[in-house]
Amino acid sequence: MTSTHHSRRSRETPQPEMSIGRYTRLDEIGRGSFATVYQGVHTKTRTYVAIKSVNLSKLNKKLKDNLSSEIHILKGLYHPHIVALIDCHETTSHIHLVMEYCALGDLSLFIKRRDTLGDHRYTRDMIAKYPNPPGGALNEVVVRHFLKQLASALKFLRDRNLIHRDIKPQNLLLCPSPSSYRSGVTQVVPFKGSEDSFNPATGLESLPLLKIADFGFARSLPATSLAETLCGSPLYMAPEILRYEKYDAKADLWSVGTVLYEMVVGKPPFRATNHVELLRKIEKGEDRIKFPEENPASDEIKALIRALLKRNPVERLNFPDFFQNGVITSPIPGLVADDLPSIPQGPPADPETAEATPRPDSRSGATVPGGTEREREGPSLPKGDTGLTQRPPSQNQRFGTPQTTTPMRRIGSGDRPPSTPKESTPPMTYPQRPSAVSHATAPGRQELVDRNATFTAMERQKGRNTFSEGSPQIDRQADKLREERERAAQDVAFERDYVVVEKRAVEVNAFADELAHSPRIQGNISRGAQTGALSRRSTVHGPTPSNPSPPQATVGKAMQVLSGRSRADSMHNRQGSYERRYGQSPTSATSAISKALNMASGRLFGMGFSPPLAITKGGRSPPLAYNPFPAYPAHGSLMIGDGAKSNLALDEDTKTVQILEECATRSDVVYGFAEVKYKQLVPLAPSVQTDPSSKLNLAGERENPDSADGGLTVDAIVTLSEEALVLYVKALSLLAKSMDIAGAWWARKNRGDGFGDSAMSRANGASTLAGTRINNVVQWIRNRFNEVLEKGEFVRLKLIEAQKRLPPDHPSHPDNHSVGSSLGSGASVDVVVSPGVSAEKLMYDRALEMSRTAAINELTGEDLSGCEIAYVTAIRMLEAVLENGEVPRFGQDKDDTSKDSDKIVLDAVQADERQVVIKLLTIQAVVASIRSRLAALRKKLAILAKRAPTPSANVPSKMASSNPVSVGATPPK
């Protein structure tokens, strides 16, 4: 599809030619995670195509099924501004997708090389007529031309209820101008996917032709997985996607705004080193889009960009208004005489009529050759394509405009006559595969629906559009709020294929949505809101969260925690998983667990594990009691502490809360350990360093800005990636178990032990509190699960990349991997870790190291409060090692599950390693020993606290409170 992105390997070693059907595969021109793109040529007509070869061994079953479904849909999409799928061939090892060839590459390269376009034979005339301004990127005539063609393609997709979801300059491919084909300037002639493939539906025929590429593959065949995309270049993603919020087709309009800005200015509107910083910049900008003073863009273009780049999708320009915008519908100003229309054609650039209006040159014999040959070829597509190669006229009509020309179609089976109105009587239907959704704000159900692509076009969207158009401006905001909330409960969200445990991710998010939006749970939350219960930050300007509102009023909102106590070091908003990672102050970059891990950390590869950050702003002060959960009413609050047995008689709901919180806390300890490894692989960006004036790396050495890996060797990267990956997988398993515990509780409630007049309305209110607390923990688990999934995928890709850089004789080099040593199930690419690397072994060694270091410090009287944290963390980590995947049965005492603990088998610890662990000491004995040390330490701390004078408000206390870790204590993240 592009001829400009030649890989270095293809230039050094020419690829052998290969016959694929009627085409010959030539040199490699691009490479992605799942596919390699080659230049190809038709064996008879010698016209060019792009051949995308997908390696089936890198796809799991779901990705293969989704790919087949998407190919079936793509064969029915024929539009001048969408790269067409011409043919498809499948072998035992690959699927070869034959697509239209775009000789000018993509728009990002076009903008980057704007200063040299005058030297290229395909763009020399364009620059002569419309030179690029010195203070901008592209001439506004060219910008409007590309925007019209992009809008035409989006209108075509919108009419078919399709969303691209990955609009960016890299996916906008360019072909030489249609006039250059007729004049003979263009020597590389592409094969035509349809009769009108290179006849523009709108815009100018003397300028390059824009086509959207990779449509549909965002769901079934991503160029990169979710984590890689977010950690790579999410510069064009809508903020609602970055926030893991509900999103719909309006996300495409944000992307259009970023592309339009880049065409005008020469760079994206928001740039950052990672998606966390990117989202922060978008939020900080508060919809104030600035342009360079010397930029010559017109006010009309700037106003359109500002209308598209609205953080709130409700405030963002909608599709009808976008398609009717003057920039889209009005003639392009500033045309040279040669490009002025010779005859009146009404609005010459209106996408509503341009596609149905015959062009003087659209049937010229001098157009791109290959179409007539296509008629002589006979069938070339696989079975089942007959119904897709002949398009009914009704699918080419725009906004009810009568069809006046031969419909745009692919001629693929002999000399087929043009479609007649009779052929359009049976409406074309496209089977829509079940969406792998993880609804962020509302429960959803996966269904297989055959949607009528002709006139059954998502009535809820049509209703939204007509509603917003016909409403007065004064009521527009309220009407949009109501309509967006109703639609948010139905539309598809997060249709992304996580490479790791994708199905589990869908289940986790679906259950969290169901619990969060249950009227019974929501009623409890609203009653407890005044005491600090969970509230929601509206993504739109709606009523304040504290006001009582119906349960559906929370749909489409993101999480926010309102702590019961106002404290300078604890006030924070939870918005997805990102802001917990990088807070707004240096204190939020760590936690008590991080401190405990740092205290026990040795030196690895000459680097420290993380910077020694102060817990609070006052320097040395009592460490905050660590707990990862949101703050909520603590009526008889359970104290997690160190997990020791309590003699209190607990009802079933309270037991569920206790077990759930303990399991989630163990997962958080493992997550904190994994973060130690992760932060070495991904050094902190300059904007989130604790000391802005310091440019030192984690080892205290001067940072090298040119070092992408922070100075780590390849062996170190492999080791860190392996350890981080197995720890993240362990954390995911604990989070999944926590969600299973909550799911079992919820199932029992739905079977009969309901809320309201029964269990949840007891006099002491314990069950009401339990429901609220379980919901809060479930929402935390959901956010953490998604975050760990994303980071785990990043580490997986980092590991695969680093292993390829190892010497060929290294045991971890991909060529030396055995089939049976791969990690993970269902992953698109198998991950192989070195023998002996397991999460349980790492956690066991770390727990022993932490407890021993804490014991030494306790004996010397140093940092007793830190010793307490280290003991608790070590206990939790060892409990996580002993954790199995079974959900506890209720009615069974917690201690009953550990009666057979001597028979526990550590799944990931190999036989020889298990023997080493057993020889040292049984884990249960280690836990008991650490608990005894912790009890003695707390007695010592209590005695010291009684003897010590009460510290003043300005002098932080050296010793911490002896109270166990409370559920309600939420440290800054």
UniProtKB/Swiss-Prot annotation:
Reaction catalysis annotation: L-seryl-[protein] + ATP = O-phospho-L-seryl-[protein] + ADP + H(+); L-threonyl-[protein] + ATP = O-phospho-L-threonyl-[protein] + ADP + H(+)
Compositional bias ranges of the Polar residues kind: 387-407, 523-537, 951-965
Known EC number: 2.7.11.1
A GO molecular-function annotation: protein serine/threonine kinase activity
Places the protein is found: Cytoplasm; Preautophagosomal structure membrane
Gene Ontology CC annotations of this record: Atg1/ULK1 kinase complex; autophagosome; autophagosome membrane; cytoplasm; cytosol; phagophore; phagophore assembly site; phagophore assembly site membrane
Active site residues per record: D166 (proton acceptor)
Membrane topology of the entry: Peripheral membrane protein
PROSITE patterns in alphabetical order: PROTEIN_KINASE_ATP, PROTEIN_KINASE_DOM, PROTEIN_KINASE_ST
Region of interest called Disordered, as start-end residue ranges on this chain: 338-446, 460-482, 523-587, 949-973
Pfam families: ATG1-like_MIT1, ATG1-like_MIT2, Pkinase
Residue ranges occupied by any Protein kinase domain in the UniProt entry: 23-328
Biological role stated in the UniProt entry: Serine/threonine protein kinase involved in the cytoplasm to vacuole transport (Cvt) and found to be essential in autophagy, where it is required for the formation of autophagosomes. Involved in the clearance of protein aggregates which cannot be efficiently cleared by the proteasome. Required for selective autophagic degradation of the nucleus (nucleophagy) as well as for mitophagy which contributes to regulate mitochondrial quantity and quality by eliminating the mitochondria to a basal level to fulfill cellular energy requirements and preventing excess ROS production.
Family membership noted in the UniProt record: Belongs to the protein kinase superfamily. Ser/Thr protein kinase family. APG1/unc-51/ULK1 subfamily.
Protein name, UniProt field: Serine/threonine-protein kinase atg1
Organism taxonomic ancestry: Eukaryota, Fungi, Dikarya, Ascomycota, Pezizomycotina
